[in-house]
C-alpha cells in the first residue's frame, strides 16, 4: 500500500505541534539549487547532529476523553506491546551518512555524535520567527566551532490509529514525524527546512498478533523512506 500523507497544511501543523513550537507554522524551505557551489557553503564549517530518538509507541488521536482513551488502549494492548519493542537502530547511522554526503559536495562537515536534547535548548525568541530556527543553537556554535548546523529532529515514531471518541476511523498506520533544518548559526536563518510527516498502513491484514508483521514491515519502511527523503537533497 503506498504512503499516504495528510494535506500539506495539516502535516505541517502537526509537525510543529509535535515539536513543541509555538507561533506560526514553519513552511518548508527548499535548499537552494546552487547551494553547494556557493562561496558561503564552501568556506563555512557545518555540524550534523540528530536529536534523542523517541521510543516507538502507539497513539490514538481523536480518542479525546479519558474513557475513550482507555477503551482504545485496551483494544490495542497486544499491538502496543509489540510497537514498544520496535527498534530505532536503523536511524542511528543517518547523521554519519549526511556528513559523508556533505563532504562529497566539498563541504567541511563534522559529526556531533552526542544526541541533541532539543527541549533543553533555550528558545531563540526572534521578533519575526519566519524562516528562523525556533531554538538557539549558539552553544553548539561555540563548542564545535561551527558556522552552520544540520539538525535531524525526530519527534514521534510508532503506530497511530485515528479515532472519533470511542470509534476507530481508520486502520493503524506506522508513523514518523519530525523535521530537518539547516541553520545559519550567525543569524539562525533556515537555509533548509524539511518537515517529516510520514505514515504507512500494513500491506494486507494488520491485526496479526502477537508480532503484527504487517505493521512491523510498514514501520521499517517508513524509517527507510524518511531517511531517503533527508539524504536526497544533499546528494544532487
Q: What are the residue ranges of the model-derived segments?
A:
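A structural "domain/chain start" motif
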Residues: 22-119, 123, 234-236
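Bacterial N-terminal signal peptides
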Residues: 9-19
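Extracytoplasmic/secreted envelope proteins and their assembly/folding machinery
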Residues: 91, 95-99, 134-138, 223-227, ...
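Outer-membrane beta-barrel translocator domains and adjoining extracellular loop/strand segments
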Residues: 163-168
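C-terminal/domain-edge helix-coil "capping" segments
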Residues: 21-58, 106, 144, 156-159, ...
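Bacterial N-terminal signal peptides that target proteins for export
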Residues: 1-10
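Short, solvent-exposed, polar/charged sequence segments at loop or secondary-structure edges
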Residues: 101-151, 160
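Short capping loops/turns at secondary-structure boundaries
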Residues: 91, 130, 169-171
Amino acid at each position: 500500500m503506498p504512503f499516504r500523507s495528510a494535506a500539506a497544511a495539516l502535516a505541517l501543523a502537526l509537525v510543529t505541534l509535535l515539536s513543541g513550537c509555538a507561533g506560526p507554522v514553519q513552511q518548508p524551505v527548499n535548499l537552494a539549487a546552487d547551494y553547494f557551489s556557493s562561496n558561503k557553503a564552501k568556506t563555512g564549517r557545518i555540524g550534523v547532529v540528530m536529536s534523542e530518538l523517541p521510543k516507538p509507541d502507539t497513539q490514538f488521536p481523536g480518542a479525546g476523553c479519558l474513557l475513550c482513551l482507555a477503551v482504545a488502549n485496551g483494544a490495542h494492548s497486544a499491538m502496543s506491546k509489540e510497537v514498544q519493542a520496535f527498534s530505532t537502530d536503523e536511524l542511528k547511522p543517518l547523521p554519519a551518512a549526511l556528513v559523508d554526503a556533505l563532504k562529497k559536495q566539498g563541504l567541511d562537515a563534522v559529526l556531533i555524535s552526542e544526541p541533541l536534547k532539543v527541549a533543553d535548548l533555550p528558545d531563540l525568541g526572534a521578533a519575526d520567527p519566519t524562516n528562523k530556527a525556533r531554538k538557539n543553537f549558539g552553544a553548539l556554535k561555540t563548542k564545535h566551532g561551527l558556522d552552520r548546523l544540520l539538525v535531524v529532529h525526530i519527534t514521534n515514531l510508532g503506530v497511530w490509529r485515528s479515532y472519533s471518541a470511542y470509534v476507530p476511523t481508520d486502520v493503524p498506520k506506522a508513523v514518523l514525524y519530525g523535521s530537518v533544518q539547516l541553520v545559519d548559526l550567525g543569524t539562525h536563518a533556515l537555509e533548509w527546512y524539511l518537515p517529516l510527516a510520514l505514515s504507512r498502513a500494513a500491506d494486507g491484514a494488520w491485526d496479526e498478533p502477537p508480532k503484527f508483521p504487517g505493521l512491523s514491515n510498514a514501520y521499517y519502511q517508513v524509517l527507510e523512506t524518511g531517511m531517503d527523503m533527508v539524504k536526497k537533497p544533499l546528494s544532487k
